[in-house]
Amino acid sequence: MAHNYERSVFYQLNLENAAGEFARYDLSLPEPLSESAPLMTRISDNMFRARVQQLKGLAYREYENEAFRLMRDGLTASALAKRQQPHLSVYSDQIVWGRSPVRIDLAGGWTDTPPYCLNEGGNVVNIAIELNGQPPLQVYVKPCREYKIILRSIDLGAMEVVTTYGEVRDFMQVGSPFSIPKAALVLAGFQPGFSTESYVSLEEQLKAFGSGMEITLLSAIPAGSGLGTSSILASTVLGAISDFCGLNWDKNEICNRTLILEQLLTTGGGWQDQYGGVLR
């Protein structure tokens, strides 16, 4: 069945049980699937191979990582297909102020985690909450006279000045306090391949844009609190940048791009966190 998957129901089986049988009887893995195979089939195939190898006590991370890479690439392809054209939409003395609550997950947690939710769907019940009557996640975006991007974090006491596309693209740097705004800037079109226009440098793009940019973050609740902090902060950053850059993303688009942003950061996780804070 595995060798003849195109005409069989192999990848519709319980692949956890199938992997157990392959390991139990020491069966050889089927031939790798071609790149023309459906994306979800290729993801399932790699997770199946990873589980078989794991049960046999063999190296399996390569297959597992490939499965998540395929899922990440499949999601980010939608962002590349819809390139952005950011333009300054505020006056020099104006500030865009984004604020969001966090959320409490009442039921259904982890049913929103891929690839499970892609096959089975997910159902999660959330409620949005504030901290002492105020939204605990806040983002400020304002023009900067110099053609650079200044990133600040009030709660972390950190600052970084970004002057090149390479520095924007460096959002996967371990321990960086500005991974989220950098990835958000990429999705907003401040990176070759994500913009409808082509520029030699970030400075040239900012000159065409009309100003530099200063982004300030404030999170009164730490990441890892279980309240969807990172995801909702990402949505707040994306929403503020959208208003500042005239991208006109609605709430559903912002939440969808948050999913893509988290895939860019390779943090993964569930897909409903941001909805609990944005759709209220």
Tell where the protein language model's regions lie, with residue ranges.
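Active-site signature of alpha/beta-hydrolase-fold catalytic machinery across serine-
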Residues: 236
